[in-house]
Amino acid sequence: MSTIKSTVLLCFVFISIVLVMFVISVIRVPQLSVEEMRSKGVFILPRPRDIAEFELRDHTGASFDRANFEGRWSFVFFGFVSCPDVCPTSMAVLGTVDRQLQSGDSELAEQFQGILVSVGRDRDSLATLGAYATAFSPRFLGVTGPREDLVELTTQVNVAFAKVPLAEALTQRTQNTEALADAYTVDHTGNIVIINPRGHYHGFIKLPHDAETIRLTYQTLAAQF
């Protein structure tokens, strides 16, 4: 009788272990290896870099500095509102990631912060920037400031930007120098910069941007941090 009981108990324990392992495999957050991330254009720094103090403004007019990065994973894109292609595309991808997270793990969603830093401050007012950034997600922030203040941040995260006159404007026969001076675009790095919850530059994601890659990268980093 005791042998039968022992056998039944062992079977029960075995089945329980199998069930637990199955449940864990189902609910385990998918993660990417460093090699997988690199193959998808995601580059994580061997040692995250501290970011020195800087001061910009968010679209509500509030000060935005290093402390605003702390406590969350920030995925930051540098662009401008009238950018015709890469900016709206990349921000739309970040918006998709945010919605996916919102429909899943609430804690993961809360720790995700999408930010657009406008490097076109001459044209992008805070109100315009706010309307643009929040169109992709009401939780997103638009941030900007004078060029010298922007450079204090961009140089620390390997982002470059420059005002470039439009070739079409330069060939126009016009005496309207004011209009000519205003005819420009802004060339800028297309990476999405990753800032970790300590406010350190953690890595970057190269173009083209993909929602699934960004979501899996975020889940991986958050789980390992």
Where on the chain are the PLM-derived regions?
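Short active-site neighborhood of thiol/selenol oxidoreductases, capturing the structured segment around
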Residues: 64-94
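N-terminal targeting signals for export/organelle localization
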Residues: 1-53, 225
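Hydrophobic beta-strand positions
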Residues: 55-56, 194
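Short, internal strand/loop/helix patches
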Residues: 130-189
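Thiol-/selenol-based redox modules, centered on thioredoxin-like
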Residues: 167-225
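Short loop/turn microsegments at loop-to-beta-strand junctions
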Residues: 51-52, 74, 189-191
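Structural microenvironment flanking redox-active thiols in thiol-disulfide oxidoreductases
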Residues: 91-155
